[in-house]
Amino acid sequence: MSLSTLSHPAAAAAAATGSGKSHFRTAPAAQSVRFPKARPPVPAAVSAASAAVHADPAEDRVSSLSQVSGVLGSQWGDEGKGKLVDVLAPRFDIVARCQGGANAGHTIYNAEGKKFALHLVPSGILHEGTLCVVGNGAVIHVPGFFGEIDGLESNGVRCDGRILVSDRAHLLFDLHQVVDGLREAELENSFIGTTKRGIGPCYSSKVTRNGLRVCDLRHMDTFGDKLDVLFKDAASRFQGFQYSKSMLKEEVERYKKFADRLEPFIADTVHVLNESIQQKKKILVEGGQATMLDIDFGTYPFVTSSSPSAGGICTGLGIAPRVIGDLIGVVKAYTSRVGSGPFPTELFGEEGDRLRKAGMEFGTTTGRPRRCGWLDIVALKYCCQINGFSSFNLTKLDVLSGLSEIKVGVSYSRPDGQKLQSFPGDLDTLEQVQVNYEVLPGWQTDISSVRSYNELPQAARLYVERIEELVGVPVHYIGVGPGRDALIYK
């Protein structure tokens, strides 16, 4: 198969400097990004679904996606974004993460049904012809990143030459994780319920401009001084944070080794992605977390520290808004949430336990049991306003099998009965809303083996179509199980 190459600008710069003495690392001059010219074959699941509905436009769902497309969460996370990215990846040259870090947990399965729980590595990694990019908007915990790579390679997944990490991405240190726990302890009754992965403190370092970036690993002569500032800042803010010069020395030595191993992965991903767009390469953006956890648009302060909505694609990858096309919103057939924060449609007692057990609702990253409730149309419409979704992937429809009736939260009212016209930004208002429900009939049939939309029970189809009517966005993909093939194309 013939190959085209896209050289790293870092490689060109290294070559231009000649053999003059330098105290910092540069990328090898021969380093390049290689793409297969021919698109990999469509997965069997897609081919089978297409063959089954040959006369239906559904066969074009995957191939008709725009050059730059995105998969974003449209609730509070854990919707099943990784599975859809894994299914779509063979149709794309690049899969890119634009924000977040190891707080995101994406569970995917290979063709043999083996489970992979990814946190930072993009979900396209299981497909040999796909290049995976971790953009500048992400935060990189280097030991965790290497741990994921080691786990993948020990299971036969080749990562060498297939992952690029932005030189502009910020480094997340163990100290950020320590600070995360100390801050949660200080908040006491205002417990936010973070993943304790250090995400918030790392983004805080970024905003206060004392954070370190991946490119700083190429300047180890000044790395220690910059890290010293970070350690001292943490020690000045938290009494429980112990710091010494020996700790700093140990961490610097540790990162010298990390720098050597990480070097082949480092690239100017802004350049790589924009050059790829010019070359008509197809890019799939994989969002972490979800819109209702967005730092600006989520249920603040019970949110993440980045922008997992459409705007985060541009700021987290360095690509222009005009090049972004289809955005697929991934929405669970019910709702779940990890940690604290408002949850208007939450179910308690046996009803909540039933959804939690049937859906195996335990966090990929934390293992914590997720809070569960009915589908919230008000929140979903709000997410659509922010992101402009072209379609939905409705996941875990099979979990609702066996219910005699299914409720959908269609509107909010104040305690005095006044109906709200939009999703409230004020937390006090949101905590007091009364949810108005629409009741739909359930179905008793196990639908986990269904692969054609018309074969779903009538009540299941009614549920899907009612969601489309209420929100005004078509459902193109329906998940009926965890496996790669457990997907219906509508």
Curated annotation (Swiss-Prot):
Region spans: Disordered: 14-36
Active site, renumbered: 78 (proton acceptor), 106 (proton donor)
Transit peptide (residue range): 1-47
Catalytic activity of the protein: IMP + L-aspartate + GTP = N(6)-(1,2-dicarboxyethyl)-AMP + GDP + phosphate + 2 H(+)
Cofactor detail note: Binds 1 Mg(2+) ion per subunit.
Single GO BP term: 'de novo' AMP biosynthetic process
Stored InterPro entries: Adenylosuccin_syn_GTP-bd, Adenylosuccin_syn_Lys_AS, Adenylosuccinate_synth_dom1, Adenylosuccinate_synth_dom2, Adenylosuccinate_synth_dom3, Adenylosuccinate_synthetase, P-loop_NTPase
Binding site for Mg(2+): 78, 105
Molecular-function annotations in GO: adenylosuccinate synthase activity; GTP binding; magnesium ion binding
Cellular compartments annotated: Plastid, Chloroplast
GO cellular component: chloroplast; cytoplasm
Binding site for GTP: 77-83, 105-107, 370, 396-398, 479-481
Keyword Hydrolase: no
Residues that bind substrate: 364-370
Keywords from the named record: Chloroplast, GTP-binding, Ligase, Magnesium, Metal-binding, Nucleotide-binding, Plastid, Purine biosynthesis, Transit peptide
EC number: 6.3.4.4
Domain of life: Eukaryota
Pfam family name, one: Adenylsucc_synt
Pathway per the UniProt entry: Purine metabolism; AMP biosynthesis via de novo pathway; AMP from IMP: step 1/2
Entry-linked PROSITE patterns: ADENYLOSUCCIN_SYN_1 (PS01266), ADENYLOSUCCIN_SYN_2 (PS00513)
Classification via PANTHER family: ADENYLOSUCCINATE SYNTHETASE, ADENYLOSUCCINATE SYNTHETASE 1, CHLOROPLASTIC
Family: Belongs to the adenylosuccinate synthetase family.
Protein role: Plays an important role in the de novo pathway and in the salvage pathway of purine nucleotide biosynthesis. Catalyzes the first committed step in the biosynthesis of AMP from IMP.
Assembly, per entry: Homodimer.
Protein name: Adenylosuccinate synthetase 1, chloroplastic
